[in-house]
Each structure stands twice: as structure tokens, then as C-alpha cells.
Curated annotation (Swiss-Prot):
The modification Phosphothreonine is found at T236. One of its GO terms (cellular component) is cytoplasm. The lineage of its organism: Eukaryota, Fungi, Dikarya, Ascomycota, Saccharomycotina. The gene is TDA11. It comes from Saccharomyces cerevisiae (strain ATCC 204508 / S288c) (Baker's yeast). InterPro entries: Tda11. Residues 32-62, 252-306, 332-377, 400-504 are annotated as: Disordered. Keywords: Coiled coil, Cytoplasm, Phosphoprotein. Residues 257-287, 332-359, 368-377, 491-504 have a biased composition (Polar residues). This is Topoisomerase I damage affected protein 11.
Length: 504
């Protein structure tokens, strides 16, 4: 039961009125005493206009708001006190009004009837008012019949409620399907929009990549142009670029003489050329700050040229002088195939020793010029004079004998001087052995003219008592003297070494 049925039952209890079911209609006249037999509800049908069905399935008659008062004689339930009392209605004006009010609140549901029940309905002569309700009718129903009819109507009501539930669920399912279809359509549209956006972005990226490659190519061309303007050596061929500016600043004479040799200066200049080429290549490819780096490199190149060009040129000239002097001394002019004789204790610097080693590798490739021979002789005379002056100053400051590790002077390039060299070595070696001086066995010492004269005067004034000490001192000091051409021998020819002096 729902709330509406509970409300109706509570009102019926308060008013002491039963409006549950009316299955039979009996027409009665108020004057007639002998009443008809009441027909059972099972044999009689019911009129569709007289009934309504609640949601629970029970049949109720429409309740009168203003029931009429009946007399004791006219009351139909006097004979059967156990029967339920039903209100009799006379024709009055208030009945249609009450029915209209009740119908406005309750919408009756029509229960389908079978043809058999319609045929069983008796033809009742009565006068019908509005809404098909008889004006004079009385219904009597026993409690058992009312209960049976209530059960049957409840079953019909339950089946109708199930049908109504099915009818209500079908449209809801339809609404859900339409919503699903709508959401599906929206999702498809979103996917299409996403695909379109992806395609647009791909096209945009391709366009940007093309612009990037084009701008990179333009930038590379501009870099090449700037590098050509800043470094003119890049415009020259690769063969000409292989020569460094250091090698270009060397005099032409020395370059032509060293053309056929894999010489030390060439080996020094090649790494510099390679470094110069690599720096040029890196500068041409450098991505940023090209002008600043070019200016720095140009300034560094100019500083390198100023630092290294002159020393290397002097080194090459000095190398040539030493080479020709050694050739002249060792008589390579006569026999170029002979092995050179190593001089004992020649005082040369690191550059001179490396140059001599380099010259010994390819002696046949050298050529001699008369002008360079004169220059070399003048240079050697100047060097020997400087050495003699330095040794004279040291001996004047110190009275004791100071042995200096010096090397032999360079002799003339004739056979006679070679023979003199061998004889001088033998005499000096014998004197050194007699005097006991081991340092003079392998070393030659220079002597100056002033010291030579002083030693001669001192030796003449010494007595024979000094003996061995005097001879030792004489041999030591005489070994440090230099005798020049044109001076008297003074009986010491074995210790004199002639030094050639020529004017520049």
C-alpha cells in the first residue's frame, strides 16, 4: 500500500464509512415493503462507471462528502445485521458536485473486462445521472465476497504495476542510449580535431626546418666571405699556403742552398706551417665572434713573424758559415767522400752542435762560395780575438795558473797546418806528462803576447835551485800563451799555435 491508500483508510475510519467495493447494483423503491433477494456478487457483473481501482488493486466506490440520512424502515441492512452498511443515494443536486470534486483528485484506471462478465451483467432499469451513476441504487455485500474480490483485484493491480514499471524503464533506456551516442559523436569529433592539429603542426615543423637549413647555408656563406676578406691567404691555392710566413722571411740565398736537404730548419718550419693551416681551417669554420678571433689571430701571426723570422734567418746564415768553415778545415774540397775528423774539444753551443750533426748527414749537397769563405775567416778571427782577450783579462787579475777548458783553434785548410797540428799535439802531450798536469793532456790553452813576454823574463831570472818547480810553472804558463804571426819564437816553438788574423 502506498501513502494515498493509507490516507483513504484513515479517513474512512474517522468517518465510519466504507468505500472499498461495490459489485452489485440493486434498485429499490422506498414504498415497497417486500424486497427482492439480493443477488450474489459472483453471479452479477459490475458496471464500469461505478468502480475505480487504486494502485494496490482494490476496488473502491467514490465516497460522498455529504451522505443523506435514511429512515429505519428504508434502511436495507435491517434484516441482515452482519452485512456491511452501504450508503444509499437519492437523486439530489449535491451528488454530481461531490463526484466532480473526488474525480478531480483521483484518476480512475479502467480494468479490462471479459465478454463473459459483460454478458452476465443483468439489465437493470434505473435512471442515470451525470457520469453514468444511477440515482437510486443500493448494494449489499457480505464480508467473504468482499475479501475474495479484493484478492482478485490486487492480483490485477500487481500485474498492472509490473507493466507500468516496464513501460517506464523502456524510455529511460532509450534516453541512455541516445546520451551514449551523443558522447560517442563528440569523442569522434575531438579525435578528428586532434588529428588535424597534429597534421598542422607537422607541416609547420617542416616549414621551420626548411627555413633553418636555408638560414644556416646563408650564414655559412657569409662566414666564408668574411674569412676571405680578413685572411687573404685563404684566396691563394693550397700549395702556396703550405709555406709559413716564417719560411718566407728567410733570405733567398739561404733558401736556395738548403732546397735539396731535409734540414732541421725545414723540420722546424713544417709543424708551424701545419699549425698555421689548421688554425686557418678552424677560423674559417668557427661559428661565433669571427671578426674578433680573426683580429687576434692576425695580431698573433704578426708577432710570431717578428719574433721568429729574424732569428731563423740568422741561424741559417750561421749554419752556412760553420758548414763552409768545417769543409775548409777538414779538406772536404779535395775529398768529399771521406769521413770527417772530429776535432777535440771544439767549444760550440747547442745550436752549433745540432747544425754540425745535420751537416754531416748530407755533406755532398753543399757548395762553397768565395764570398762566404772570406766572411767565415773574418768571423773566426773575430771569435779567436775575443777569446784571447777574455783569457788575457782573467790571467792579469789572477797570478795563479787558471786552466780553462777551451778547444783547439781552427787551422788553415792546407796540408802543412794539418801536419803542424799533429806535431803540436805530440809536443804538448809530452810536456804535460813531464810537468804532471793531467788537465792539459786533452785540452789546448791560449796564450797572449804580454803574458808570453812576462813569462820569458821571469824564466830567465830564475835560478837553478828552483829546479823542477820552475820547469813546471813554465810549462803551465807557456801553454796558455797565444803567439801571433810575425812574433819571434823565443825558443818555444813547440807550444806556439799560430792564429790567423784578417781584417773585416
Amino acid at each position: 500500500m502506498n501513502k494515498f491508500d493509507e490516507f483513504i483508510e484513515s479517513n474512512e475510519k474517522d468517518l465510519d464509512v466504507d468505500t472499498s467495493t461495490r459489485n452489485s447494483i440493486i434498485s429499490m423503491s422506498p414504498v415497497r415493503k417486500t424486497g427482492r433477494k439480493i443477488r450474489s456478487a459472483s453471479s452479477n457483473g459490475y458496471r464500469l462507471e461505478h468502480h475505480r481501482t487504486s494502485s494496490a488493486g482494490s476496488m473502491h466506490s467514490q465516497r460522498l462528502m455529504t451522505p443523506t440520512r435514511l429512515n429505519d424502515q428504508d434502511h436495507p441492512l435491517q434484516a441482515k445485521p452482519d452485512a456491511r452498511r452501504v450508503v444509499t443515494r437519492h437523486s439530489s443536486v449535491s451528488v454530481p458536485n461531490a463526484m466532480s470534486k473526488r474525480r478531480s483528485l483521483i484518476q480512475p484506471m479502467v480494468v479490462p473486462t471479459t465478454p463473459e462478465s459483460q454478458n452476465n451483467l443483468p439489465s437493470v432499469s434505473h435512471s442515470e445521472g451525470s457520469y453514468g451513476i444511477p440515482l437510486e441504487s443500493t448494494t449489499v455485500l457480505s464480508s467473504e465476497q468482499a475479501m475474495a474480490s479484493g484478492l482478485r483485484r490486487s492480483r490485477n493491480g500487481s500485474s498492472q504495476s509490473v507493466n507500468s514499471m516496464i513501460a517506464t524503464t523502456i524510455p529511460t533506456n532509450g534516453v541512455d542510449v541516445s546520451a551514449l551516442l551523443q558522447s560517442l559523436a563528440t569523442k569522434e569529433l575531438e579525435l578528428l580535431e586532434c588529428k588535424q592539429k597534429i597534421e598542422d603542426l607537422k607541416k609547420q615543423t617542416q616549414h621551420e626546418e626548411q627555413n633553418y637549413t636555408r638560414r644556416a647555408r646563408e650564414l655559412h656563406e657569409l662566414k666564408e666571405q668574411v674569412s676571405k676578406h680578413l685572411d687573404p691567404s685563404l684566396n691563394t691555392p693550397v700549395k702556396n699556403r703550405a709555406f709559413s710566413p716564417v719560411y718566407q722571411n728567410i733570405p733567398l740565398e739561404s733558401r736556395t742552398e738548403n732546397a735539396g736537404n731535409s734540414s732541421l730548419p725545414s723540420s722546424v718550419s713544417k709543424p708551424k706551417n701545419m699549425g698555421h693551416q689548421s688554425t686557418n681551417q678552424s677560423r674559417s669554420v668557427s661559428p661565433q665572434d669571427i671578426q674578433e678571433r680573426r683580429q687576434r689571430d692576425d695580431s698573433s701571426d704578426s708577432s710570431k713573424q717578428s719574433l721568429w723570422s729574424k732569428p731563423l734567418a740568422l741561424f741559417n746564415q750561421f749554419d752556412k758559415i760553420i758548414q763552409h768553415e768545417i769543409e775548409r778545415t777538414l779538406n772536404w774540397d779535395d775529398s768529399l767522400s771521406g769521413t770527417p775528423e772530429v776535432q777535440e774539444g771544439t767549444p760550440t753551443s747547442n745550436s752549433e752542435s745540432s747544425a754540425q750533426q745535420y751537416d754531416n748527414e748530407a755533406p755532398g749537397a753543399r757548395q762553397k762560395s768565395p764570398s762566404q769563405g772570406s766572411v767565415s775567416r773574418s768571423l773566426w778571427s773575430f771569435v779567436s780575438d775575443v777569446k784571447a782577450g777574455l783569457l788575457g783579462i782573467e790571467e792579469e787579475n789572477d797570478n795563479d795558473v787558471i786552466t780553462d777548458n777551451r778547444c783547439d783553434p781552427v787551422y788553415k785548410s792546407d796540408r802543412q797546418h794539418e801536419q803542424k797540428k799533429s806535431t803540436h799535439k805530440i809536443t804538448n802531450r809530452g810536456q804535460a806528462e813531464d810537468s804532471g798536469d793531467d788537465s792539459s793532456l786533452n785540452m789546448r790553452k791560449f796564450k797572449t803576447t804580454t803574458k808570453f813576454q812576462k813569462d820569458n823574463a821571469g824564466n830567465n831570472s830564475l835560478t837553478d835551485e828552483s829546479g823542477h818547480r820552475t820547469r813546471e810553472k813554465k810549462s803551465k804558463r807557456s801553454s796558455n800563451k797565444l803567439s801571433f804571426i810575425g812574433e819571434p819564437d823565443n825558443d818555444n816553438s813547440s807550444v806556439k799555435n799560430s792564429v790567423e788574423m784578417t781584417d773585416f
